[in-house]
Regions:
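N-terminal pre-Walker A segment at the start of P-loop NTPase domains
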Residues: 1-15
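Hydrophobic anchor at the beta1->P-loop junction of P-loop NTPases
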Residues: 24
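Conserved lysine of the Walker
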Residues: 32
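Hydrophobic positions on the alpha1 helix immediately C-terminal to the Walker A/P-loop
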Residues: 35, 39
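Short glycine-rich substrate-engagement loop in P-loop NTPases that contacts/grips substrate
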Residues: 54-85
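Structural recognition of the conserved hydrophobic beta-strand(s) that form the central parallel beta-sheet
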Residues: 91, 116-122
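Interdomain motor-coupling "hinge/lid" segment immediately C-terminal to the ATP-binding subdomain
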Residues: 128-249
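Accessory nucleic acid-recognition modules appended to NTPase machines
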Residues: 200-371
């Protein structure tokens, strides 16, 4: 099992004096259940696990009473160990299937804060927005979980190389031996992506298993569309989801409704886009032509790009074979750029860097991401390889003179005045590397 960084956040949650019941959000199969079980086994004397989509009787308990002591007592009868305050982690999985259990968290917070309760659900984001029940606003803690990062993948694949990776503490170029080995590991990660079951197949060098598992996950997502949306909305969700590869195949990546379906209009597909966002399956990045703080005030919500939650899923959704990453075929060059952008976004978001805007100046220049950091706006350009020609970042610098410019590419780590080149495989270390800029 991967050593997930979110375990540290869970440990901090456990020790908080003002701890509330936890709602862990995240797309299906990013590893929420396995992480919570490991956390319960390692950090508590006991772990009581209930899956509310499989155990209908458990949901009945929440329907019949709102008293947390009575709920705890009845749940204890269903486990081999008593559920004890401070000593037991109570895990309520797939809680979106039991709205009464979500509502009950208010009473757990107010009346029995000594009990550690962690809730998870693949479609909790949808439940918050669309189910007709009372959500316990202010009575729960939230935590977001994402696919396995490259750094987590690297630790499992090569512990020694991971130690070096985490020890990088300057902007000096990496020695060739480390750069080359990290590049090789990164190629493996880009093929598999970060869905835990898939990434583990890659660790085991089971390439056939990688492809099969990715296809199975995509099939599960398609079934979710049908199960959790009306027939009309499910059809539109599927159209948007399947259009993702063609949306990113264009040079400017801007979302075009005509690629979803001929004659499609925004008002018909807005709900489908929102559904995919709330389910954690896509990221939406809006145009911001005036990169001033706060970026939110200058965004154009009508012009945007969408990306997948995971670069491995995007590759298979686009029907690209793993060999594409090992080829220098110019036909694949443009889509390599899209996959590189998707990876950088995935890495930044997972590591706590809000990345929801890009910059463009007409049709002449575009910077893939701009990130607000305090009172500064940092432009971030993404290149998939070692060919880094292009004038967009130069044009941005000429117009706005930012304190820092970042380019991600497969060139070595380098600092030149206010410009920093970060190898794609070091994106997980972006926050630390920015801190080394003087």
């Amino acid at each position: 099992m991967f050593n997930r960084a979110i375990i540290q956040e869970l440990e901090q949650w456990k020790e908080r004096r003002d701890r509330k019941p936890l709602m862990m959000l995240g797309a299906r199969q990013v590893g929420k259940t396995s992480v919570l079980k490991k956390f319960g086994e390692d950090s508590f004397e006991h772990c009581a696990y209930f899956s509310l989509d499989e155990e209908e009787g458990v949901c009945d308990i929440f329907r019949k009473t709102k008293n947390p002591q009575q709920i705890i007592e009845q749940l204890s009868y269903l486990t081999s160990e008593p559920i004890l305050p401070h000593k037991t982690l109570l895990i309520l999985d797939e809680i979106q299937d039991c709205p009464e259990a979500i509502s009950a968290m208010k009473y757990f917070c107010e009346k029995t804060p000594e009990y550690a309760v962690a809730c998870a659900g693949s479609l909790l984001g949808l439940a918050f927005g669309h189910q007709g029940f009372s959500f316990p606003v202010g009575k729960v803690d939230h935590m977001n979980m994402y696919p396995v990062t490259f750094s987590e993948f690297l630790e499992q694949r090569d512990a020694g190389l991971y130690q070096y990776y985490m020890s990088i503490d300057s902007l000096e170029p990496l020695p060739d031996v480390f750069f080359d080995r990290l590049s090789q590991a990164f190629t493996a990660y880009r093929i598999s992506g970060g869905m835990p079951a898939v990434a583990m197949k890659m660790i085991e060098k089971d390439l056939e298993g990688v492809e099969t598992t990715l296809r199975n996950i995509l099939q599960d997502y398609s079934l979710d569309f049908v199960k959790h949306a009306t027939p009309l909305l499910a059809n539109r969700i599927s159209h948007v989801w399947r259009s993702l590869p063609s949306q990113l195949a264009k040079e400017n990546r801007k979302f075009v409704y005509q690629l979803v379906r001929p004659g499609a209009r925004a008002r018909e597909y807005e709900d489908a886009l929102t559904w995919l966002q709330n389910a954690g399956l896509i990221y939406k990045v809006s145009l911001c032509s005036t990169p001033q703080v706060p970026l939110k005030s200058y965004e154009d919500l009508s012009i945007f790009k969408i990306y997948s939650l995971d670069v491995g899923l995007l590759r298979v959704l686009a029907e690209l074979s793993p060999e594409a990453y090992l080829s220098d075929n110019p036909i694949f060059k443009e889509y390599k750029g899209a996959l590189a952008e998707n990876y950088i976004l995935q890495s930044l978001v997972t590591n706590g860097i809000k990345c929801s805007h890009y910059w463009a100046s007409g049709n002449t220049a575009e910077v893939e991401f701009i990130v607000q950091r305090g009172l500064d706006v940092i432009p971030m350009e993404v290149k998939s390889g070692t060919s880094v020609t292009g004038r967009s970042l130069i044009e941005y610098n000429r117009k706005y003179s930012p304190h820092l410019r970042i380019r991600y590419s497969m060139l070595n780590l380098k600092k030149d005045d206010t410009f920093v080149n970060i190898p794609l495989f070091l994106a997980d270390r972006t926050e630390q590397l920015i801190g080394y800029v003087q």
